[in-house]
């Protein structure tokens, strides 16, 4: 019976055979990072080709969206940076909420080490950048080297496989989440122009309504999506960058499920038995299937359901499209300028030197002062290698650069600095981790005493 079942289950439809290579690629943990690299390479090739003008023109085409008299007309570039990136920041907000409630940031004891390290990884790069650029308009770019591209950083660690301990990946994930929190605060507080109080109050009112829906037990994503669009439009009109709306809405999404676990197990078994005993394609069999599907939706929290549902869209559409539309900088004629320009130098040094130095130094101070404990199996060399990988600013740095400089030469210089530093930091961090694993694990751990102190 089981062999017959396996035989039937193994028969794939023609369309499944056709798309199976793409499905296998999408299931690779590093697939999103590979797609980002391809998107960036395509943008750079196009921007440095004889058809450079068409690359710029395609993103400047205006697009209109809205309902009734409320219409927004923005270029494709702005719809990507203000609209689609709001969905990315919504996903970031969901990840932050999950980490705070049930993840590495649940307790201050667990959060202290990556939190302090992340602060160092934002403060030191910003200081280095400001020292490089001095005064003037270029100062506005101080937030660019503060960012870490979590998708790329984790993608590099995944490619290293079992050469690194799992706790190092957890540390980088927690650090990147704190880094994202700081980035959101920086965007909201320092890259906001004129504030329109009425629109801001409308947005906050929408957030309050969404919290009310949460308390009432409303879990349908469509309800939160509808009010989320209203919050986004109000934030856009308020002068605060529209992506902040995504984070605010994420904090209102329910993180609890609405079904008892034991009841779900018993009810699920009963429904499966009912389905098994019913006639194929009968009303009873369809009722059992739909009821079981509803039970599955109820046992999973809206936060997890949305996070799981949005992740592929963000990883395989939004972020590659953002990279493709923002990474196209013309190297021809700019490289000679960039190697001497304070903005490109400041961004590059901030990411390549400031990030690893800040993370490692603040982590070391936290452990030596006994303010925080590091995972006992990690060595300082592993933390340093991971800190270097966190210097991959890429998409997040490009995004903040677009907020800081808009268009023009300063934006091009910051892009060149970001791309160069991200590449070198990723390679150097990978080499350090690869070499240390090849040499063995004889080096002493960061916190020898943490095993007895763990809870």
Curated annotation (Swiss-Prot):
It catalyses: Na(+)(in) + 2 H(+)(out) = Na(+)(out) + 2 H(+)(in). Signal peptide: none annotated. The keyword Membrane applies. The chain crosses the membrane at residues 31-51, 83-103, 113-133, 141-161, 170-190, 198-218, 231-251, 309-329, 345-365, 383-403, 414-434. It is found in: Cell inner membrane. The keyword Protein biosynthesis does not apply. InterPro entries: Na/H_antiporter_dom_sf (IPR023171), NhaA (IPR004670). Keywords: Antiport, Cell inner membrane, Cell membrane, Ion transport, Membrane, Sodium, Sodium transport, Transmembrane, Transmembrane helix, Transport. Pfam families: Na_H_antiport_1. One of its GO terms (biological process) is regulation of pH. It is a multi-pass membrane protein. One of its GO terms (molecular function) is sodium:proton antiporter activity. One of its GO terms (cellular component) is plasma membrane. Na(+)/H(+) antiporter that extrudes sodium in exchange for external protons. PANTHER family: NA(+)_H(+) ANTIPORTER NHAA, SODIUM ION/PROTON ANTIPORTER NHAA-RELATED. NCBIfam families: NhaA. Belongs to the NhaA Na(+)/H(+) (TC 2.A.33) antiporter family. This is Na(+)/H(+) antiporter NhaA. It comes from Koribacter versatilis (strain Ellin345). The lineage of its organism: Bacteria, Pseudomonadati, Acidobacteriota, Terriglobia, Terriglobales.
